[in-house]
Amino acid sequence: MKTLDENQAPSRQTPESHRRGAEKLSRIPVKVEPGAPLRKPDWIRVRAGSGDEVRRVKRLLRERGLHSVCEEAACPNLAECFGHGTATFMILGDICTRRCPFCDVAHGRPAPPDPAEPERLAETIALLRLRYVVITSVDRDDLRDGGAAHFAACIRALRTRSPALSVEILTPDFRGRMEIALDLLAADPPDVFNHNIETVPRLYRQARPGADYRQSLELLARFRDKVPGVPTKSGLMLGLGETLDEVREALRDLRGHGCEMLTLGQYLQPSRDHLPVVRYVPPAEFDELAGYARELGFASVASAPLVRSSYHADQQAAIIGR
């Protein structure tokens, strides 16, 4: 019987069901040509994921049958977040129905939603004594509601177990199921609604096959219409070949659709089979874009090379009083 490595996410040890790399990306419309990667600049420094607190959080996730996007997507901030006892939880399994070539989450045929997951999640978060939590998911194009009912069930379980907890959700685009999904989430709303547009519209075909830029903007706007008291949040990764003018236009689009919170970070290639990094954006440009975003009226902006959607999400939400 195969023994799993406790330090590695279970999905990374079962390649027969969890496809990654070339096997995952073989059917995308724009083929990735592996090449020599750009050398990482000095400002991209990632700590190794070790230490007692990191091991404790990983062990807790394994024991509870839960997943974190920190591990599944190979986030560069894993050691920092796990080291402080925090994690961004990924619900609805660890297998995605899409094959986005920037993302390291596994592709395959997912299992049905686990009805016991919301309660296990609530118990784990209470055990960690978290005050702020981010819940995300894989894409579930196989489900009639895109997984929205499961998001709502998790929010209800969290509110019941930890009434003082603030909950941010980072959702997929609910392609073809937007109204059903929004009705479910409006009945059990989070404290922050996050959906990333990821990149500029020109790069969607190669970076987000199966997704639509305008639909992502519409999702943010429609949620705001249904639940006007809950702020919306979105983010982009830079370094895929976009221009600064294209990024500025995307920021204007987000503000035009009522988005209040923003994250901007550097794209990092998970493997040579993924989309290559076209450019490492210097910190000064992230600062410049942060200033531009604030001029547009974003209430909360996190913009730096290693910023990710949920990185210091509690601090970002506190700026607008969530």
UniProtKB/Swiss-Prot annotation:
Residues 1-14 have a biased composition (Polar residues). Residues 15-26 have a biased composition (Basic and acidic residues). Gene3D superfamilies: Aldolase class I. [4Fe-4S] cluster 2 binds at residues 96, 100, 103. [4Fe-4S] cluster 1 binds at residues 70, 75, 81, 310. It holds the Pfam family Radical_SAM. It is found in: Cytoplasm. InterPro entries: Aldolase_TIM (IPR013785), Elp3/MiaA/NifB-like_rSAM (IPR006638), Lipoyl_synth (IPR003698), rSAM (IPR007197). GO terms for molecular function: 4 iron, 4 sulfur cluster binding; lipoate synthase activity; metal ion binding. Belongs to the radical SAM superfamily. Lipoyl synthase family. CDD domains: Radical_SAM (cd01335). Its cofactor is [4Fe-4S] cluster. This is Lipoyl synthase. Pathway: Protein modification; protein lipoylation via endogenous pathway; protein N(6)-(lipoyl)lysine from octanoyl-[acyl-carrier-protein]: step 2/2. It is an enzyme of class 2 (transferase). GO terms for cellular component: cytoplasm. Keywords: 4Fe-4S, Cytoplasm, Iron, Iron-sulfur, Metal-binding, S-adenosyl-L-methionine, Transferase. Residues 1-30 are annotated as: Disordered. It comes from Methylococcus capsulatus (strain ATCC 33009 / NCIMB 11132 / Bath). Residues 82-299 form the Radical SAM core domain.
